[in-house]
Every structure is written in structure tokens, then in C-alpha cells.
Regions:
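N-terminal anchoring/stem segment of glycosyltransferases
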Residues: 17-129
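Short, glycine/charged-enriched secondary-structure capping and boundary segments
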Residues: 99-100, 131-132, 177-179
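GT-A fold catalytic core of metal-dependent nucleotide-sugar glycosyltransferases
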Residues: 145-192, 199, 203
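Short catalytic/ligand-binding loop motif for oxyanion handling, primarily in non-cytosolic enzymes
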Residues: 93-95, 124-127, 171-174, 178, ...
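Conserved hydrophobic/aromatic beta-strand scaffold that supports enzyme active sites
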Residues: 205-207
């Protein structure tokens, strides 16, 4: 694959803009010319850039993070919950057939769980976001994908239970699923050791 095809596939000018705004453009270019352009090299480049961004954010917000850690007091009593959270902002009636089938598979198999579908219409019944967050979402600065990242954290913090992405198909009955999926204090999939293709995933949030 040529440089032009790789550039276009990885996001083109939008990727360059994103890396520039994140302050990691030099790192990305250096890694690209150092590692090469095969699949494994590009995956390692992505991980390297992610780590660099994380370092920059930790440095930038070090004082705020330290203040939060020292002053935050969780007064909420956390109890075991049987809630399963799913989100499709447009409502199930407007969802693709894939999402409808996945949602029905949860209802059919997780029969002892309270499955709750979050939409743009009922979201404020469960969580309250600051006005500036909602305004950025309405204007498109925060995408639906990024909004669900905020939403899943708020729901799990305040209500507990499990978050499942709307495109996850459940193929086993609740009795066949290991209890630690539901009963752990915190559960998510991760891949810590890079595989042969260089892929690693610290946190995969499609099921939490």
C-alpha cells in the first residue's frame, strides 16, 4: 500500500489536524518514518501516540487531578444492581435492524436483569449533565459516540449495573454466563500485551 493510500485510510488531513492539536504530530511523524508502514508498525504508532497524549494530559491537569483525589468524598452507598444499560439516542423504533436484534437478544437471554434503553428523550430522567456539555452535544462538537462515553460512566457511577453497547449480540442465557461479568466491582475487557500485530487495548468500554 502506497503512502497516499495509507494517509487516506488513517484519516488524512483530519488525522494531521488532530495530532497537531494534541501536540503529538512530531511524535507521530517520527514513529512513522522509524517503524515503517506495515500493519504492525501503524498499530504501534497509534499506541505510542495514545501514550504521549495521556502523558501530556496528566501533566497539564496534574494540579486538578491531585486536588480531586485529595478532596473528593464519595458519599453514595453503592449496592449491587441488576440494571443493564443500552443506548440508542434516536429510539429503538428508529434504530437499524442490527440494533433491534441485539436489543431483543438481551431481553431474551438476560431475563433476570432490568434492561433500560436510554434515548435522547429519557436521558435526563437518569443523569444530569452540565449545560455546556449539552450545548456542545447539540451543536455537534461532542458526537453521539463521545456522549455515550460520558453517559455510561454517569450511569454506572450512580446506579451500578452493566453497560452494553447497542450492537452487542447476546447468544447465551443468563445461567450460562459467568457471574463475575455481573458481580465484579469493576469489569471490562482489555488486552495488555501487544499481539503479533502490535495491538493492545488498556480499556475496552463496550461492556462494563
Amino acid at each position: 500500500m502506497g503512502l497516499k493510500e495509507i494517509f487516506k485510510k488513517q484519516g488524512g488531513l483530519n488525522l494531521i489536524k488532530q495530532y497537531h492539536e494534541s501536540g503529538v504530530l512530531k511524535t507521530a511523524l517520527g514513529e512513522f518514518f522509524l517503524l515503517g508502514r506495515d500493519k504492525k508498525a501503524l498499530e504501534i504508532l497509534r499506541l505510542s501516540v495514545q501514550f504521549k497524549v495521556k502523558q501530556r494530559l496528566e501533566k497539564k491537569y496534574k494540579r486538578q487531578i491531585q486536588y480531586f483525589d485529595e478532596n473528593y468524598k464519595d458519599k453514595k452507598i453503592h449496592e449491587k444492581s441488576n440494571k443493564v444499560w443500552v443506548c440508542w439516542f434516536q429510539g429503538l423504533e428508529n434504530a437499524p435492524e442490527l440494533v433491534k436484534k441485539c436489543y431483543k437478544s438481551l431481553q431474551a437471554n438476560l431475563t433476570d436483569r432490568e434492561i433500560i434503553l436510554i434515548t435522547s428523550e429519557n436521558m435526563d430522567q437518569y443523569v444530569k449533565f452540565p449545560k455546556f456539555i449539552l450545548e456542545k452535544w447539540e451543536k455537534g462538537y461532542i458526537t453521539n459516540t463521545h456522549m455515550t462515553d460520558l453517559l455510561r460512566l454517569e450511569l454506572l457511577i450512580y446506579y451500578g449495573g452493566m453497560w452494553i453497547d447497542s450492537t452487542v449480540l447476546c447468544t447465551r442465557k443468563i445461567e450460562e454466563i459467568s457471574e463475575y461479568y455481573f458481580d465484579s466491582d469493576l469489569f471490562f475487557y482489555q488486552l495488555l500485551k501487544p499481539g503479533r500485530d502490535g495491538q493492545a487495548q488498556l480499556i475496552s468500554s463496550w461492556l462494563m
